[in-house]
Amino acid sequence: NIGTDIVAKAPADGYTLLMGVVGPIAVNPSLFGNLPYDPIRSFVPLTPVADIPVGLIVSARIPVKTTREFIQHLKANPTKVAYGSVGNGSFNHLLMEQFKTAAGVEMLHVPFQGAGPVANELIAGRIEASVLAPRGPWTAGQVNLLAMISTKRSPALPNVPAITEELPSFQPFGNWMGFFAPTGTPEAVVRKLSEAFNAALQQPDVRQKIEEQQWSVIGGSPDQFGK
């Protein structure tokens, strides 16, 4: 929120931009009543950059391989399973709470400061689950990726089911990132910046770096992003 507010108050000259993500722009306004910025009034959208897929990941110490098995495990062990997030009100906190509601289960929430500590505790087995980007040690047998938090399978991981395949009542929200400028930025500058970002997203080396993270390149106009 601090960085987002700094950009909101910056000169609207095209030289200070926000790489916005779903939390500060789309989620936090519903969680905090005293935000110093307004995501609609304080910014103009430039270009959506990427969709960032996340997955339901559990410790390998839990004897489950599917979302259904995980739900059964939770119902058999109520209040004994803890999940981690990158902080109160974060995207993975909210998604795990959505999962709990949809599945009718209980888990203890343990907030951390960043994804690194969550991953470390998950690998060590000191927490049992989280929603994180499916990369890093996830293929090394230390944890199990049960499902992608989406309504369709990821092209990067076609063998991993979408969570709605096993839990249809779960309706996940998207996890994206994109560029914004302070409100008042001249329209010509907005267009020029958007065109430059879209051109960059078409460069093979840029796309490769994004896709190496198992993200999906988006791109698009300010109007498309604003919708």
Regions found by a protein language model. Name each.
Residues N1, I25, V64, S90-H93, ...:
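Loop/helix-junction capping segments adjacent to catalytic residues or to phosphate/diphosphate-binding pockets
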Residues I2-A12, E97-Q98, A102, G116-I127, ...:
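Short helices/loops that flank or line small-molecule/ion binding pockets
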Residues K9-T16, S30-P117, I163-E165, P172-K209, ...:
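Hinge/capping helix and adjacent helix->loop/strand transition within the periplasmic-binding protein
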Residues G14-L18, G55, E128-A129, L145:
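Short, Asp-centered acidic motifs that coordinate Mg2+ and/or phosphate
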Residues L17-G20, P48, F112, V131-A133, ...:
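Short beta-strand and adjacent tight-turn residues that come in two discontinuous sequence segments
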Residues G23-N34, Q98-A102, A129-V160, R207:
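A ligand-binding cleft/hinge motif common to bilobed small-molecule-binding domains
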Residues S221-K227:
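Extracellular/periplasmic bilobal clamshell ligand-binding domains
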